[in-house]
């Protein structure tokens, strides 16, 4: 067996010593076995990766620094390691213990494997879902990097009483209590290769079959939660790095084994100790980039009046799938997510299946605030969600479940198909009939939106401040507890010694020394009482402030629907004005946006002279976010580029706003290019760029107070003017 001098293994289960030469194991222990020891056992080259087939193995437990034998059925292979170890001592044959997979986990050590905790269509283990839901109800708090305390009770019966810190510790403790890391060593090695080669997103490397299905589902659920945590932070960048540092070691538990090149020789690119943190940081960045679409969906619109279908009893033909308002044909999953965003449970639509197989469709249903994808099967002219297929058409299938609960098909989906997303939506819901009247009403709604936004921002600042103060008070209470413990120990020692000295001075008749000892004892008791009183007062303040903090969070949550609704209404009016030909300068006045000084391009007499007509001045092809930010570094506001997005079939616009680079997705739909419905109206990227050369992006995102003014490769605009 040539190659490395030894190999590392990680314990999956606890093992108690049966013989003096045995090693005791705890889950997560790293064990080192020398190559010479495996050669002495007759292990063939390559079989060291399958410790369960080796049997008893001699090695070193790096946690306890003890040597001994351990069962190969209790460990998993990590990778090669360089070492210089003495050879094995001879030992006789010995039967292996049974692999402890089927029995209940030892309290406080391990949980069942993920496949034993949940199964699709559930998206994650119930314990983790319960903890995450409790955290997001309590208020998204920062995860602390400290390791969690060992938990022996996972019933979570009192989870509603936990504060944010205890809940976040619960999530971390859950990940540590799993019998195997959420990201398996094999998947971590694939992710490391993708991260090292920088050939594209790392996320696909952590999908089945590389990562087991239940692990992949749980990882996706956790990343969605952490994405919301990072998105809630005032500065997402530092929050992503902090979450990576906290959760990287929990998800991988150890760096992955190095992945050798095809030739088999090491290439010097072994994972660094900070790889777990970098991997989680990269996954969160990719998740946030997928969510970087700024504009929310418009509210549901009433369907156009259509003649009612003629009943079969009257000799008419059955309703066609193409005529069904809820059937959208060949649209992407991203478009479906956009149409169902912020809709109530029971909202649904049907599209062609992504498999493109004739007769197969996908029903997307809103349930529990998430989109549930249900496949519609087809065989021999019949349709259904599962065998037996009993419906003669998709229309019959959907009509049935508009009146009957989907719990007949899946107990988790206890809802009917209540609210179809209609493709026959009117384009506007604006009651005014003149541009000036609509503009005046737009100004009112925009002002209301800004007022609510300011109120929300003030509440968020107050919530952040009080959360920090609460953490300081908790730390102070812990300090009080330690101080009380020290003083009480001192009091016990003093009381023990005082009895001896009091008896001695009483015999000697030394009243003065007796009074001094008694006075010191009273002072110490008084001081302990003062500290107890201070701690009690601080605990009362903590409870009161925690209650106020929860009230602030409730007020913030109550403002969110108002903000979303006001923004949707405002967007309706913006679309109406744009389609009626209102000038952007006038729209900016209604929105209270100051029209900036004319730049060199707006002074051009002929719009045909704009550099925007040359795609090479702004289209840069396939580059990533970091490369785009480097190209735009130091450029003036309004400098932009268009690149391919990490989302398949989409593009991304990167633009400088207030000296910082912002990114937003450009969708390509059946109606054209655009940043969101109903703005996907442009026949080409060039048409979109020319429109937003004079139209502000603020109508899509309040933070994008800029136009696409300066193509990044166009001559002329340089760096921003130096500060005076």
From Swiss-Prot:
Regulatory subunit of phosphoinositide-3-kinase (PI3K), a kinase that phosphorylates PtdIns(4,5)P2 (Phosphatidylinositol 4,5-bisphosphate) to generate phosphatidylinositol 3,4,5-trisphosphate (PIP3). PIP3 plays a key role by recruiting PH domain-containing proteins to the membrane, including AKT1 and PDPK1, activating signaling cascades involved in cell growth, survival, proliferation, motility and morphology. It comes from Bos taurus (Bovine). SUPFAM superfamilies: GTPase activation domain, GAP, SH2 domain, SH3-domain. The record marks 144 as: Arginine finger. Phosphorylated in response to signaling from activated receptor-type protein kinases. Dephosphorylated by PTPRJ. Dephosphorylated at Tyr-651 by PTPN13. Phosphorylation of Tyr-651 impairs while its dephosphorylation promotes interaction with FBXL2 and SCF(FBXL2)-mediated polyubiquitination. One of its GO terms (biological process) is cellular response to insulin stimulus. Heterodimer of a regulatory subunit PIK3R2 and a p110 catalytic subunit (PIK3CA, PIK3CB or PIK3CD). Interacts with AXL. Interacts with FLT1 (tyrosine-phosphorylated) and FLT4 (tyrosine-phosphorylated). Interacts with NYAP1, NYAP2 and MYO16. Interacts with FBXL2; PIK3R2 is a substrate of the SCF(FBXL2) complex. Interacts with PTPN13; dephosphorylates PIK3R2. Interacts with XBP1; the interaction is direct and induces translocation of XBP1 into the nucleus in a ER stress- and/or insulin-dependent but PI3K-independent manner. Belongs to the PI3K p85 subunit family. The lineage of its organism: Eukaryota, Metazoa, Chordata, Craniata, Vertebrata. One of its GO terms (molecular function) is 1-phosphatidylinositol-3-kinase regulator activity. The modification Phosphotyrosine is found at residues 460, 601, 651. Residues 81-118, 250-275, 290-319 are annotated as: Disordered. Residues 87-98, 254-264, 296-306 have a biased composition (Pro residues). InterPro entries: PI3K_P85_iSH2, PI3K_p85beta_SH3, PI3kinase_P85_cSH2, PI3kinase_P85_nSH2, Rho_GTPase_activation_prot, RhoGAP_dom, SH2, SH2_dom_sf. Residues 109-291 form the Rho-GAP domain. This is Phosphatidylinositol 3-kinase regulatory subunit beta. Residues 326-421, 618-712 form the SH2 domain. CDD domains: iSH2_PIK3R2, SH2_cSH2_p85_like, SH2_nSH2_p85_like, SH3_PI3K_p85beta. The SH2 2 domain is required for interaction with FBXL2 and PTPN13. Keywords: GTPase activation, Phosphoprotein, Protein transport, Repeat, SH2 domain, SH3 domain, Stress response, Transport, Ubl conjugation. It comes from the Eukaryota. Residues 4-80 form the SH3 domain. GO terms for cellular component: nucleus; phosphatidylinositol 3-kinase complex, class IA. The gene is PIK3R2.
